[in-house]
UniProtKB/Swiss-Prot annotation:
Role description: Regulatory component of the inositol phosphorylceramide (ICP) synthase which catalyzes the addition of a phosphorylinositol group onto ceramide to form inositol phosphorylceramide, an essential step in sphingolipid biosynthesis. Helps the medial Golgi localization of IPC synthase in a COPI vesicle-dependent manner.
Tree of life domain: Eukaryota
Protein name: Inositol phosphorylceramide synthase regulatory subunit kei1
Pfam family, one: Kei1
Compartmental location: Golgi apparatus membrane
Oligomer status and interactors: Component of the inositol phosphorylceramide synthase complex composed of at least aur1 and kei1.
Length: 236
């Protein structure tokens, strides 16, 4: 008898990351629709950012990149808002990839702007203490980061980052549900443009995310064969 069992990574991934509903009472499809409209409202601010670039020439390259990416994401989310209610597997996968990229970009921009803001606090505080030679050394960036005034801002950043990560899991779970329910297999897709796009979208999803739909599809297929066999036996 083996002392150690090889962990079932696919089942563990499904148990931790695959959600059954949105907030415990809404379906995944309704959750994805809500997520898309929240994203559209959020990305509208990118339009105002583009306008502000023409009025302010002091914008950093990161700000320009953030505003441009917001406009591109606004276009993509507006397009996906039309197709997600139709329960389309390719569009559900596109939503997952787009929202994941948007989440990673938001984390990157948040970290960059937070570091820039706190570094300016350090510089302003150190310049105010330069007049006194015997004064204590200026506080470090880590000290200002965890000051009482900064803790609420830090908690808000963590809350919204956690909420967006949960939204990423919802989009992943919705695409997983559509794949499982439809029983789509990459090798069975048609050779047309739509089939090639769907196969391309499913390839990284299968490799890196979850292969449980293959197991579920096989189990469902086996159960249907057993049911047909029992019915045939009863008829005979």
């Amino acid at each position: 008898m083996a002392l150690f069992r090889r962990p079932n990574w696919s089942a563990l991934f499904e148990k931790i990351f695959i959600q059954k509903s949105f907030l415990g009472f809404c379906s995944l499809r309704v959750g994805c629709e809500i997520i898309i409209w929240f994203a559209i409202i959020n990305k509208v601010s990118g339009l105002y950012g583009i306008v502000s670039l023409f009025q302010n020439s002091d914008a950093s390259p990161w700000q320009v990149l953030m505003y441009v990416s917001s406009v591109l994401m606004l276009i993509l989310f507006s397009w996906l808002a039309i197709h997600i209610p139709k329960s389309s597997v390719p569009h559900a996968l596109i939503l997952f990839y787009v929202y994941l990229i948007d989440f990673l970009l938001n984390v990157l921009f948040t970290v960059l702007f937070a570091l820039s803001w706190f570094s300016k606090l350090v510089q302003s505080d150190s310049s105010s203490t330069e007049e006194s030679a015997d004064s204590d050394p200026s506080p470090s960036l880590l000290y200002l980061f965890f000051q009482a005034e900064s803790i609420p801002s830090l908690l808000l950043l963590i809350f919204f980052a956690s909420l967006k990560f949960y939204f990423v899991l919802i989009t992943l779970s919705y695409s997983n549900k559509l794949i499982v329910d439809s029983g789509i297999r990459p090798q069975n897709l048609p050779p047309n443009f739509s089939g090639r796009v769907t196969r391309l979208l499913m390839k990284p999803y299968i490799m890196a995310a979850n292969r449980s739909y293959l197991r579920n599809h096989t189990k469902r297929f086996t159960d249907s064969i057993e049911l047909e066999q029992r019915l045939m036996d009863e008829v005979v």
